[in-house]
UniProtKB/Swiss-Prot annotation:
UniProt keyword terms in alphabetical order: DNA-binding, Isopeptide bond, Nucleus, Phosphoprotein, Stress response, Transcription, Transcription regulation, Ubl conjugation
Keyword Ubl conjugation: yes
Top-level taxon in the UniProt lineage: Eukaryota
Function, in words: Heat-shock transcription factor that specifically binds heat shock promoter elements (HSE). Required for denucleation and organelle rupture and degradation that occur during eye lens terminal differentiation, when fiber cells that compose the lens degrade all membrane-bound organelles in order to provide lens with transparency to allow the passage of light. In this process, may regulate denucleation of lens fiber cells in part by activating DNASE2B transcription. May be involved in DNA repair through the transcriptional regulation of RAD51.
Naturally occurring in which organism (per UniProt): Canis lupus familiaris (Dog)
Keyword Transmembrane helix: no
Protein name, as recorded: Heat shock factor protein 4
Source organism phylogeny: Eukaryota, Metazoa, Chordata, Craniata, Vertebrata
Length: 492
């Protein structure tokens, strides 16, 4: 049995050495346990060679346990630290399994230093449950200050909410006022500029193309009779033939707006429908009234519908008559061809002009002052066949029973007119004037001597129409070809 370790000094001192430190000092200094625990060569630390054997063989002799972990925990409680050597600090496990512990007051040969080794006393916890009076007073003051700031913030928030509500009400009121002002401004603009827009659009819609292709004006109100000036160039000759522009009839619907001859009666110093006379023109020529009779072909349904229409030229009064003849018949009459059928082409030869004939009275022409209907204004040779007949009337049937069996040409109409006089140098090269028929005699009515205006479409006669010289001809802008034939002689 091993000898008991050297007894630690037991003399009374100011502080006794703890039992664990006395046992450890004896254990390290025992030469019989140097193979398991010993001093280091420097004497400032001790080494444990084999931890497992040390725990099984040595610890039970000095301590009540054989647990190495408990031994190491007690060393740590007294301030011992584990020394890590260079060999143990590497990644490879060292060959020797030993542990080294070190304390500044645990040195070999200096036993008096053991009094300095003290067990670590855990720090006493402060009593948090207790509050000092000064701390409580300070905390109460801070809480009161925070409460005052909170009350001020709540009051400010309530004020901001009230101001926000007031602003929203003002915004709603301003929006309503803004919308009302917009509506008022819109109504004012509509009242101020609405008539102008309506007048401009109505004028644009009612604006008509000029009846004469080179000069003329338009009547602003085609629904009633107006006193409008006529071009000065047109008021010096009694008879005119002109190709009208398309869509000159205003009184008929779109299905009845077809082209046809226009016969116009120009009389001098005729009073206007409202009882006023025309004022003289700017050029010094006298204003002349113009009565227009437009002939429109029958509708496809076979019924000839007539309506009041107004020519694009400005006029005193305008009357539109139903179409008395078809386009083919009028073309045949104007060209002077007798053998004409509405269905076939024109292949008849030009007949020789007949001798002079007597001028029919105004009853025959239907130009009485009291009768202003379209049928009365047209000569009997241009009157329409009865509407009951389905077949179109031929040229000979239209001319009346007195002219059956012979051809009718415009030369007969030429013989009814008086002497012709050529136009002045200011007229167009294709215009011819007639002055004979327009001069009223002592036994004539002023209506009989009034000029007539025949308006024939350019599409009826092809490139040129062979017409007698008794009629003044105006060429269309599309075709400037001479309407007069080479054999026509404008001289009387």
């Amino acid at each position: 049995m091993q000898e008991a370790p050297a007894a630690l000094p037991t003399e009374p001192g100011p502080s006794p050495v703890p039992a664990f430190l006395g046992k450890l000092w004896a254990l390290v200094g025992d030469p019989g346990t140097d193979h398991l625990i010993r001093w280091s060569p420097s004497g400032t630390s001790f080494l444990v060679s084999d931890q497992s054997r040390f725990a099984k063989e040595v610890l039970p002799q000095y301590f009540k346990h054989s647990n190495m972990a408990s031994f190491v925990r007690q060393l740590n409680m007294y301030g011992f630290r584990k020394v890590v050597s260079i060999e143990q600090g590497g990644l490879l496990r060292p060959e020797r399994d030993h542990v080294e512990f070190q304390h500044p007051s645990f040195v070999r040969g200096r036993e008096q230093l053991l009094e300095r080794v003290r067990r670590k006393v855990p720090a006493l916890r402060s009593d948090d449950g207790r509050w000092r009076p000064e701390d409580l007073g300070r905390l109460l003051g801070e809480v009161q200050a925070l409460r005052g700031v909170q009350e001020i913030t709540e009051a400010r928030l309530r004020e901001l909410r009230q101001q926000n509500e007031i602003l929203w009400r003002e915004v709603v009121t301003l929006r309503q006022s803004h919308g009302q002002q917009h509506r008022v401004i819109g109504k004012l603009i509509q009242c101020l500029f609405g008539p102008l827009q309506t007048g401009s659009s109505g004028a644009g819609a009612k604006r008509k193309l000029s009846l004469m292709l080179d000069e003329g004006s338009s009547c602003p109100t085609p629904a009633k009779f107006n006193t409008c000036p006529l071009p000065g160039a047109l008021l010096q000759d009694p008879y005119f033939i002109q190709s009208p522009l398309p869509e000159t009839t205003l009184g008929l619907s779109s299905s009845h707006r077809t082209r046809g001859p226009i016969i116009s009666d120009i009389h001098e110093d005729s009073p206007s429908p409202d009882g006023t006379r025309l004022s003289p023109s700017s050029g010094g020529r006298r204003e002349k009234g113009l009565a227009l009779l437009k002939e429109e072909p029958a509708s496809p349904g076979g019924e000839g519908e007539a309506g009041l229409a107004l020519a694009p030229n400005e006029c005193d009064f305008c009357v539109t008559a139903p179409p008395p003849l078809s386009v083919a018949v009028v073309q045949a009459i104007l060209e002077g061809k007798g053998n004409f059928s509405p269905e076939g082409p024109r292949n008849a030869q030009q007949p020789e002009p007949r001798g002079p004939r007597e001028v029919p009275d105004r009853g025959t022409l239907g130009l009485d002052r009291g009768a202003r209907s379209p049928e009365n204004l047209l000569p009997p040779m241009l009157l329409r066949a009865p509407p009951e007949s389905v077949e179109p009337a031929g040229p000979l049937d239209v001319l009346g029973p007195s002219h059956q069996g012979r051809e009718w040409t415009l030369m007969d109409l030429d013989m009814e007119l008086s002497l012709m006089q050529p136009l002045g140098p200011e007229r167009s090269e294709t215009e011819l004037a007639v002055k004979g028929l327009n001069s009223p005699g002592p036994g004539k009515d002023s209506t009989l001597g009034a000029p007539l205006l025949l308006d024939v479409q350019a599409a009826l006669g092809g490139p040129a129409l062979s017409l007698p010289g008794a009629l003044t001809i105006y060429s269309t802008p599309e075709s400037r070809a001479n309407y007069l034939g080479p054999g026509a002689n404008p001289s009387p």
